[in-house]
A protein has these predicted regions:
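Alpha-helical transmembrane segments and their immediate juxtamembrane cytosolic regions
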Residues: 1-391
Length: 391
């Protein structure tokens, strides 16, 4: 956003400056998140198998690691939304702010569901290998055909599963080391890039890989098979340099820094937009001229280093203060709920998060639906044994 005549103006840089859309091919990194997640889930499942840990115990540990940092963010914004409501702030304003702050949570709404299915998808990978990946990709392609050709738009929302499950399978391939030489990996990358290029320039898909200036059409809302192609492109390119990166990380200091960042990565991800909102509010009340610059102008670009510096000044202390929630291990003596109970609670968490990521607090298609979504997340957390009140 920027300030014009003393008021905030919400705008889309991709719509105002369409020539910048190519940057989204670089900065759309969600496929990498799911690929790394697939690798991590494979490692975790292998460890659980060696230790004789059953599904319920494994799932309890994974949910604790994922949901605990999320609850802090939701609690904070839930309290703030209530304070804004009783202060007389317009519901649309509260919705705009909270929706922006909670956008990162959509990832967990999908990833938690994928984690619950990980034992099945990993078994499918072990049995069928790349055929399991191709089967999911084919299903995703069929859904896109239904979306565009048959105009069954509602089916597009199922792509949150098919697209991201396909990309997640790449993480299993990485873990198994069945990818070949760096040259072969670069071939994967070129194949992904060529497929993405063909889909966009010969198909109905928009160019932008983050958001879209095209009304009602996006590669991400809901996901499209273009994200699979982008994921393959990124996957091949990054893994082609895995060996030199491993040598680089043999340095004790670099490895220690990597471990430190990994221990707080969920905090960084979940809170970065909240910090951006804080910086915007501070700059607005400080009459900061940075906010009066129209996005995309040369002056606006010149101010980006200062803007990023302000973000880091607030984000870094917060990152070091909050990871206690992220790093805190699940108590060894904590009872483990039965698997069906955990699954039911996790589904409730996913549904509540999905709603809040889409609509935020303060305004709802039906009255009090935002409150119901928040309560659903809390109740699901209790049901899954993630709250101290669990017995």
């Amino acid at each position: 956003p920027w300030v014009q005549d003393g008021s905030f103006v919400a705008g889309d840089l991709l719509e105002m400056r369409p020539q910048m859309q190519w940057l989204t091919w670089i900065f759309q990194v969600m496929p990498i998140f799911f690929i790394v997640g697939g690798y991590a889930n494979a490692v975790s499942l292998e460890s659980a198998h060696r230790k004789g840990t059953r599904y319920a115990g494994w799932l309890a540990g994974r949910l604790h690691r994922l949901v605990t940092p999320l609850l802090g963010l939701l609690m904070g914004w839930g309290v703030l939304a209530m304070a804004l409501y009783f202060s007389g702030v317009a519901g649309d304003t509260t919705r705009l702010v909270t929706r922006a702050a909670l956008i990162p949570t959509w990832f967990l709404a999908i990833y938690i569901a994928i984690v619950m299915l990980a034992p099945l998808t990993y078994r499918a990978w072990q049995r069928w290998g790349f055929a399991s990946l191709l089967g999911l990709a084919a299903l995703a392609a069929l859904v896109d055909v239904a979306f565009f050709v048959a105009e069954l738009r509602w089916m597009g929302w199922t792509q949150y599963f098919w697209v991201w499950l396909t990309v997640h399978q790449l993480g299993y391939a990485w873990r198994d080391g069945r990818l070949g030489s760096p040259a072969r990996l670069l071939g994967w990358s070129l194949l992904g890039f060529a497929t993405l290029w063909a889909l966009i320039f010969n198909g109905p898909y928009p160019f932008a890989m983050v958001g879209s200036p095209d009304e009602g059409l996006s590669n991400t809302l809901p996901p499209k098979i273009t994200l699979i192609a982008l994921g393959v492109c990124q996957f091949g390119l990054l893994l082609s340099i895995e060996a030199p990166m491993r040598r680089l990380l043999s340095s004790v200091r670099l490895w220690a820094a990597t471990v430190l960042i990994n221990s707080m990565i969920m905090t960084l991800y979940l809170w970065h937009i909240t910090v951006m909102i804080v910086v915007v509010v501070i700059a607005y009340f400080a009459a900061n001229s940075v906010l009066t610059l129209e996005p995309g102008t040369s002056e606006w670009w010149a101010s980006r280093p200062l803007w990023i510096l302000l973000l880091y000044v607030i984000l870094l202390p917060l990152t070091f203060a909050l990871p206690g929630l992220e790093r805190r291990p699940r108590p060894a003596d904590a009872p483990t709920p039965a698997a069906p109970r955990q699954i039911g609670g996790a589904i409730m968490i996913c549904l509540g998060i999905a709603y809040l990521a889409l609509f935020g607090f303060g305004s709802a298609p039906l009255p009090y639906l935002d409150i119901l979504a928040f309560v659903t997340v809390v109740a699901g957390s209790w049901l899954s044994g993630l709250l101290h009140g669990f017995r």
